[in-house]
């Protein structure tokens, strides 16, 4: 009885077969992925805490040159930020608000340019398609195919040289 399986092993195999079938179905559908990030899009403005973190990092590195842990820097900065009063946080908040205003202007310009840039290529592409359609409609299908064949034969002649 070397090849015989127990009932438990047979059930486990059946469950695996069901799971593998279920796993194959979503892959077959082909999910739509996220659109890639635009490298030209302005970076978001930092909050007051992150403005503070930029300065605190430099101080922390000077005081603790051997400590390279990002977690230690973050923890120390968080504790220090909590201990600051509102008046001590005010310069960081003001700087963050200034950066946020600059970001809002930059993102508005980006969005304005993006919408104009997106509309222009669509119109140009539509005109090109219309022009091609007009040229092709004057010719019969056989003439269009002959033109395509002629273009391909030119490439073959270049290879011989």
UniProtKB/Swiss-Prot annotation:
What are the protein's GO molecular function terms? DNA binding
Spans of biased composition, class Basic and acidic residues? 10-27, 77-89
InterPro entries in UniProt: HMG_box_dom, HMG_box_dom_sf, HMGB_plant
Q: Which GO terms describe its cellular component?
A: nucleus
Domain of life (superkingdom): Eukaryota
- Predominantly, its location class is nucleus
Low complexity bias: where?
114-123
Sorted alphabetically, which Pfam families does this protein's record hold?
Answer: HMG_box
Q: Which family does it belong to?
A: Belongs to the HMGB family.
Alphabetized, the UniProt keywords read:
DNA-binding, Nucleus
Residue numbers spanned by region Disordered? 1-46, 60-91, 113-161
Q: What compartments host this protein?
A: Nucleus
From which source organism is this entry? Triticum aestivum (Wheat)
**UniProt cross-references to CDD domains, sorted A to Z:** HMG-box_AtHMGB1-like (cd22005)
Q: Where is the composition biased (Acidic residues)?
A: 145-161
DNA-binding region located at which positions? 42-111
The portions of this protein that span the membrane are none
Specify the protein name.
HMG1/2-like protein
């Amino acid at each position: 009885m070397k090849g015989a399986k127990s009932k438990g092993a047979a059930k486990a195999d059946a469950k695996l077969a069901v799971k593998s079938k279920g796993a194959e179905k979503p892959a077959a559908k082909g999910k739509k992925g996220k659109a890639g990030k635009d490298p030209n899009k302005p970076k978001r403005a930092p909050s007051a805490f992150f403005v503070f973190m930029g300065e605190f990092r430099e101080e922390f590195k000077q005081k603790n040159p051997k400590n390279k842990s990002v977690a230690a820097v973050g923890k120390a900065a968080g504790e220090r930020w909590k201990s600051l009063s509102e008046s001590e946080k005010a310069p960081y908040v003001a700087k963050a608000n200034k950066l946020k205003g600059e970001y809002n202007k930059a993102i508005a310009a980006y969005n304005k340019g993006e919408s104009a840039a997106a509309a222009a290529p669509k119109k140009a592409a539509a005109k090109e398609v219309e022009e091609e359609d007009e040229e092709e409609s004057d010719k019969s299908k056989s003439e269009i195919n002959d033109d395509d064949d002629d273009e391909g034969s030119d490439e073959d002649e270049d290879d011989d040289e």
